[in-house]
A protein has these predicted regions:
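Cleavable N-terminal signal peptides of Sec/SRP-targeted secreted and luminal proteins
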Residues: 2-17
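Cysteine endopeptidase catalytic domains of the caspase/legumain-like
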Residues: 13-427
Length: 427
């Protein structure tokens, strides 16, 4: 009899458990097209997989839909195609956006993750803002895409560091506003955000890159054509499309199976180092426990292998080059001028990073430090030097892989931020 009661209780608990999801695409602009397209695709798949719209929190920009040079207003794509059948907006993702524009900032993001409705209401003016409010028996799936650097993520116009992210995850754990939580995160150096994630918080994370590498975009020019028209941007993230393609073809996959498959797939064309963190027992669980179960067979055809793969820090230069290549006579001068401007800025950043290096070590050591990353480093030192280069010299994020290599070699374990005369470094 006792066994029967326990079985009934277990079945009741499973039936009562809910699935929740959060989708974050927190960078704006046509050059960040994939930070709008892949979240839309993820949202649409979550709905197709049975997640209730009211159980999904969706943060994204929508300006790409009306961008002046967008040849397909109101549409969004992740793959090149001979027609517009691959438009993800037609499934309704943008009808369900909870946070956009000025509400995309670190205060709102951290408030959502920690279940702090009062803080989010104060920051947004929303009367009943959606925040994480699952229960201790519920599952949560989170997809995030934006730029990143070592121990930093960018949210809108600001950034958060690794300590802030781990603090809100700890708050959510203590508040019991989730049962089990799976994160899929796309950002350069995203692995650096979870190196110290405890394994007993019931959280599992797959990141698009390890601590040392930038992420890469795919379907960039010249592989950016839809219905015969060039979009002049990168349509998707390499890792993002890999996991979505695999999931749509293998809806009953376990977490371990999809992670292993994506690691192998991305490794064919990139050394970015897809990584995993947290509670490794999650690998045996069906991803459908978190994402829901997509229709079988897949509603999409198998896509071709990704092409035109570009490191995220090189995307602006790559896009400017192809705009100049494709420009007609009326647009040629301005397109080439923009490419020249970005080339000069890239050269300036490279020189300033090297000037920083030779101010702290000899020239041969600095040159070697550009080429190989130190595996052990002071995260706070790297963060502070990165921000100083941004604020003092005007460097843009994400930094190049070589620049991050140098900063990690400057910031060896136990060392504080060196004294730097930035007037001697910045040009």
């Amino acid at each position: 009899m006792r066994t029967s009661y326990l079985l009934i209780a277990l079945i009741a608990a499973i039936a009562a458990a809910e699935k929740y999801a959060m989708v974050f695409g927190t960078a704006d602009g046509w050059g960040n097209y994939s930070i709008t397209s892949d979240p839309c695709r993820t949202y649409d798949d979550l709905i197709k997989a049975g997640i209730k719209p009211e159980n999904i929190i969706y943060m994204t920009y929508t300006s790409d839909l009306t961008y002046a040079s967008n040849p397909f207003k109101g549409m969004i794509f992740t793959d090149p195609a001979p027609n517009t059948d691959g438009d993800w907006a037609k499934y309704g993702c943008f009808d369900h956006v909870d946070y956009t524009d000025k509400d995309i900032n670190k205060k709102v993001f951290l408030g959502i993750l920690s279940g702090d409705a009062e803080a989010v209401a104060k920051a947004t003016g929303k009367e009943n803002p959606k925040v994480l409010a699952a229960g201790p028996e519920d599952t949560v799936f989170t997809y995030f895409i934006d730029h990143g650097d070592v121990n930093m993520l960018y949210i809108g116009g600001g950034h958060i560091n690794v300590d802030q992210l781990l603090a809100v995850l700890n708050t959510a754990y203590k508040k019991q506003i989730y049962g089990k939580w799976v994160w899929f995160m796309e950002a350069c150096h995203s692995g650096s955000m979870f190196l110290n994630l405890p394994s007993d918080w019931n959280i599992y994370v797959m990141t698009s890159a390890d601590f040392a590498h930038p992420a890469k975009m795919s379907n960039c020019p010249p592989n950016d054509k839809v219905a015969g028209k060039s979009l002049d941007t990168c349509l998707s993230g390499l890792w993002d499309n890999s996991y979505l393609d695999y999931l749509e073809q293998h809806p009953k996959t376990t977490i371990g199976e999809i992670v292993d498959a994506v690691m192998a797939d991305v490794k064919k064309t990139s050394a970015q180092g897809v990584s995993e963190f947290g509670d490794m027992s999650f690998r045996d669980l069906p991803l459908s426990d978190f994402f829901g179960l997509l229709p079988t067979p897949s509603f999409r055809i198998t896509r071709a292998a990704p092409e035109s793969i570009v490191s995220l820090d090189q995307v602006p230069m790559h896009l400017a080059k192809w705009r100049a290549i494709r420009a007609d006579k009326d647009e040629m001068a301005s397109a080439v001028a923009e490419y020249e401007r970005l080339a000069f800025e890239s050269a300036k950043r490279e020189v300033e990073v090297m000037r920083l290096g030779v101010s702290l070590m000899n020239e041969k050591a600095a040159d070697a430090a550009l080429k190989t990353a130190s595996e052990s480093y002071s995260a706070s030192c790297v963060r502070d030097l990165s921000l100083a280069l941004h604020e003092k010299c005007g460097h843009s994020f994400p930094f190049s892989e070589s620049a991050m290599n140098l900063l990690r070699n400057i910031c060896l374990p136990g060392l504080s931020v060196p004294n730097v005369n930035w007037s001697d470094i910045c040009m």
